[in-house]
Amino acid sequence: MALRGWRLFGLAGTILVYIGGILFLSFVSLQSPQQKRNHARGYGEFETLRNRDLGLLGKKPPLQWCTELRYMDSPPPSPKAYKLLQTFPVNDGHQKSSNGRELTALVSFPGSGNTWLRYLLQQSTGILTGSVYKDYGLLKSGFPAENVANSSVLVVKTHEWGPQAWAPYGKAILLVRDPEKAILAEFNRQSGGHVGFASPDRYRRTKGRYWTQFVKNKLWAWEQTNLSWAKNFTGDVKLVFYDDLVENVEGTLRSILKFLNFPVNDELLACALMRKEGIYRRKKRILQFDPYSPAMHTAIDEKRSEVYAALGRFRSH
């Protein structure tokens, strides 16, 4: 009798395991195609970005700095340090400087490498850079002085132009990038963030009308940003071409620091060069099509030639 009871118990257990297995397999097989596509998307064009910029569990790895970041009027860190430090929060209660130092704008059309240059300047000086904007993504990822626009920071990021935009500044660094590449970078930023990319179907939205109007509007803004600061701003202007920065990071940084009257620390500069890529420079991605129409290319070529000639840059590309 006892033996029969054990057999019934074992049979019942087997049936329960069998039913549980069927339910599990049914749940897996009913997963929607969209969910499966989302799960597998990392193996496509975004895989490199995801692996490079995101750590375990999809979180960004902490930025590493060559020394502690500080405001201009804060005491320097102890001499021990040019070891690599992780991003740290800056005290929000810090009393901003009123030291009378001339405020310097770091100006560019969006998509011209402003964030990357800010990163390089922070690495090579240990001094925070500010901004007229408050980008929460940057605020949490290495730029704790976002929305600080006074002389407590090394430079202040802006994309604005005109008398009101110029008024606070005594000097300006004007970062200029080829409009074809800058417009594309800005389109990618609006679609995919500071280091992401626009998907190909974004260019074809509304049968291409959105992209066509975007190029027209941004080409005009590119011209206005660069010419207004170069020709109408009454303070000293340091022209920096993005291509020159890419080709000669050290020389360009040295010339910028000289313009800022900021002493070069060779150890920090060497560390900055070692870590020059950071996470704020969008990696190249080769599109399988040309997003610019022949008419767009013609308009861009004409405007590039006009602006570059006005800036004293006489090569066409």
From Swiss-Prot:
Is Transmembrane helix set as a keyword in this record?
yes
Q: Name one GO cellular component term.
A: membrane
Which residues are sugar-modified? N150, N226, N232
The record gives the membrane topology as: Single-pass membrane protein
Gene Ontology MF annotations: sulfotransferase activity
Q: What is its main location?
A: membrane
For this UniProt record, give its keywords in alphabetical order, as a comma-separated list: Glycoprotein, Membrane, Transmembrane, Transmembrane helix
Similarity field = Belongs to the WSCD family.
Q: What is the lineage of its organism?
A: Eukaryota, Metazoa, Ecdysozoa, Arthropoda, Hexapoda
What Pfam families does the record tag this protein with? Sulfotransfer_1
So which domain of life are we looking at? Eukaryota
Q: Where in the cell is it found?
A: Membrane
Task: Indicate yes or no for the key word Membrane.
Answer: yes
List the transmembrane segments. 8-28
Please state what the protein is called. WSCD family member AAEL009094
